[in-house]
């Protein structure tokens, strides 16, 4: 068996490719079922965010297993394997383990050390458990990843002051506004007419950062006004007006700055919607949705400036240099955590031998116990029989405890294999 991960991220694929492979939560059960339906895939888990899609699997054969995942991705996205392959990465065994731990720690994120990715890894594990696509190996690996993500943030300063996708989007707006005024710095949003489209987790974070950056008011646009109102109630110090998505054109006409973050699978803003508005002032669209909420042709409309998640690099670069030293400290911690999992994984090769050894001892115990009990005759009470049986089990468990513990103990793989072969020869075992 082999652990493998196949995926793409902001490092390997532009947003127009990433959005083709994005898997919404409502499609996760079927996607996991499809993967597990392949004979090569024993366990599977999917991480789908705005900046990455990664499929972690336990497979029978590395090449055939990766081939099965590639076929799934091609079918899901409608892209030929040749179109996808330049954007995909795949890692096996220790490299796959190292990669997942780096992801959970925020070391592979666009925004170094961002905290949201850990919640997304937890969600990946929860969905895998709910849809029964996880087995003991990936369940243990994901648990180790979550533990590692927490440990990195508690034992280093990596999470302190880290920007998020949402905060980077707000800073990008400030930066672009400043540049339009001839200032290469972040400017206040106090005088801007701002709209936020969507009322999910990312929109909540947008409202937090808009409030912190001086926004005086925000129009919150959502399909369901009640959902928007519940979110707005959490920001009593920010003036938030909630409106239905059917009023979107009104706010595209009057706003100077519009953030979009919805779960829509197709763009909700494009050139055909913007052109008839006849705007007289600049409109900046900042889209952090994946799939994108704003079509690429929106930027062709006069007076419209459009940005997506890939444009956040400009802001992120301003914040990263000071965090690199902390990241190096976190990398050392990750090495220890990865080794813990790999030691556990290596110890699993002892399980078949241990199970057969226990089975062999149990057979001997029951046979000898029956011989002894038959010699005791009918005067031997049921209670006395139970005492003798418990005694026989206790003796076997005591005898096996030390050798079983040593076979499972962390040690060089060659030493463990040598010990296993010795036990198999001594007790005439055949764990295969």
UniProtKB/Swiss-Prot annotation:
Q: Which organism was this protein described from?
A: Synechococcus sp. (strain CC9902)
UniProt lists the gene as: hemA
| Keyword set includes Oxidoreductase | yes
Functional pathway: Porphyrin-containing compound metabolism; protoporphyrin-IX biosynthesis; 5-aminolevulinate from L-glutamyl-tRNA(Glu): step 1/2; Porphyrin-containing compound metabolism; chlorophyll biosynthesis
Task: Using the UniProt record, name the top-level EC class of this enzyme in a single word.
Answer: oxidoreductase
Site feature location: Important for activity = 99
Q: Which Gene3D superfamilies match?
A: Glutamyl-tRNA reductase, N-terminal domain, NAD(P)-binding Rossmann-like Domain
What's the protein here called? Answer: Glutamyl-tRNA reductase
Per UniProt, what is one GO molecular function of this protein? Answer: NADP binding
Q: What is its EC number?
A: 1.2.1.70
Extra facts = During catalysis, the active site Cys acts as a nucleophile attacking the alpha-carbonyl group of tRNA-bound glutamate with the formation of a thioester intermediate between enzyme and glutamate, and the concomitant release of tRNA(Glu). The thioester intermediate is finally reduced by direct hydride transfer from NADPH, to form the product GSA.
Instruction: Tell me the domain comment.
Output: Possesses an unusual extended V-shaped dimeric structure with each monomer consisting of three distinct domains arranged along a curved 'spinal' alpha-helix. The N-terminal catalytic domain specifically recognizes the glutamate moiety of the substrate. The second domain is the NADPH-binding domain, and the third C-terminal domain is responsible for dimerization.
Q: Where does substrate bind?
A: 49-52, 109, 114-116, 120
Gene Ontology biological-process entries? chlorophyll biosynthetic process; protoporphyrinogen IX biosynthetic process
The Swiss-Prot or TrEMBL record describes its family as follows: Belongs to the glutamyl-tRNA reductase family.
Assembly and partners? Homodimer.
> Which residues are responsible for catalysis?
50 (nucleophile)
Question: Which top-rank group of organisms is this from?
Answer: Bacteria
The record ties this protein, via SUPFAM superfamilies, to: Glutamyl tRNA-reductase catalytic, N-terminal domain, Glutamyl tRNA-reductase dimerization domain, NAD(P)-binding Rossmann-fold domains
Reactions catalysed: (S)-4-amino-5-oxopentanoate + tRNA(Glu) + NADP(+) = L-glutamyl-tRNA(Glu) + NADPH + H(+)
Q: Which residues form a coiled coil?
A: none
């Amino acid at each position: 068996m082999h652990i493998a991960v196949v995926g793409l991220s902001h490092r390997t694929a532009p947003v127009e490719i990433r959005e083709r492979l994005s898997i919404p939560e409502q499609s996760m059960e079927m996607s996991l079922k499809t993967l597990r339906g392949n004979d090569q895939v024993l366990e599977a888990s999917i991480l789908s965010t705005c900046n990455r899609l990664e499929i972690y699997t336990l497979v029978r054969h590395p090449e055939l297993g990766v081939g099965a995942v590639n076929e799934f991705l091609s079918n899901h996205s409608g892209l030929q394997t040749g179109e996808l392959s330049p954007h995909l990465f795949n890692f096996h065994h220790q490299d796959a383990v190292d990669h997942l731990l780096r992801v959970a720690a925020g070391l592979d994120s666009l925004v170094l050390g961002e905290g949201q990715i850990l919640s997304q890894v937890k969600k990946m594990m929860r969905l895998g458990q709910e849809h029964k696509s996880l087995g003991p190996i990936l369940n243990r690996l994901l648990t180790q990843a979550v533990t590692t993500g927490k440990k990195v943030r508690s034992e280093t300063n990596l999470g302190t002051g880290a920007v998020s996708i949402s905060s980077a989007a707000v800073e990008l707006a400030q930066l672009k506004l400043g540049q339009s005024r001839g200032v290469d710095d972040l400017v206040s949003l106090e005088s801007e007419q701002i709209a936020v489209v969507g009322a999910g987790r990312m929109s909540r974070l947008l409202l937090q950062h808009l409030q912190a950056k001086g926004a005086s008011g925000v129009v919150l646009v959502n399909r369901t006004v009640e959902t928007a109102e519940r979110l707005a109630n959490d920001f009593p110090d920010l003036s938030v007006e909630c409106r239905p998505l059917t009023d979107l054109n009104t706010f595209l006409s009057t706003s100077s700055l519009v953030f979009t973050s919805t779960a829509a699978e197709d763009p909700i803003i494009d050139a055909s919607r913007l052109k008839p508005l006849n705007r007289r002032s600049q409109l900046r669209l900042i889209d952090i949705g994946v799939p994108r909420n704003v079509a690429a042709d929106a930027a062709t409309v006069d007076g419209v400036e459009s940005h997506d998640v890939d444009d956040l690099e400009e802001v992120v670069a301003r914040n990263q240099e000071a965090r690199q030293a902390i990241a190096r400290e976190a990398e050392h911690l990750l090495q220890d955590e990865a080794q813990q999992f790999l030691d556990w994984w290596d110890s699993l090769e002892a399980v078949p031998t241990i199970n057969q050894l226990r089975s062999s001892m149990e057979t001997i115990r029951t046979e000898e116990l029956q011989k002894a009990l038959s010699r005791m005759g009918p005067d031997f009470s049921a209670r006395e029989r139970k005492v003798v049986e418990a005694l026989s089990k206790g003796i076997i468990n005591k005898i096996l405890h030390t050798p079983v513990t040593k076979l499972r103990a962390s040690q060089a793989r060659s030493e463990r294999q040598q010990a296993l072969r010795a036990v198999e020869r001594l007790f005439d075992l055949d764990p295969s």
